[in-house]
């Protein structure tokens, strides 16, 4: 139920990947059922819906890959499908936690010059363009090209909470490059990828979990009653 509750709570979280519980039935030596054990909790790799926001700094990945973001506090790099970025007070593209978006070289994208440009746009290959007050545009260069990370086995990524992931021995290291290259997806500016949680599936799971709990509780109650009856017979 905890997994289901967590999924439902994040149905509106951009880039959130539904958690999936894998369990197995335990069987006692006599062949009787002995309950259920949790084997693992992983996440669904299915893409969520692409949702328009109209904000140029919001980005969705149309295809394979993850954004790379770096914590300015400890320098640790995380990977995410959540493209809800914005400019911070210093002009850096950051997520809601203040983690800076990385470029194709794996470095934080330099601060954008908001004094020279009235706005910006991002093309499908991750190039950031400055828009001057007179409407003319300027490609800000390779240092400002958004990178996309891929992994040899993305199912091996480890959840770091929310929509952030870290690589593991199973996933392999991140391979950061240009959007649209090496099987990486292209970018869509002004959109975000929504949560891939299906409310319908979670409600079905909740009903089944409740039914299983009630059935197990009934079995325990019946077993207790039978044991009590046997004790009464012996006495």
Regions found by a protein language model. Give the residues of each.
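Amphipathic alpha-helical polymerization modules
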Residues: 1-106, 112-235
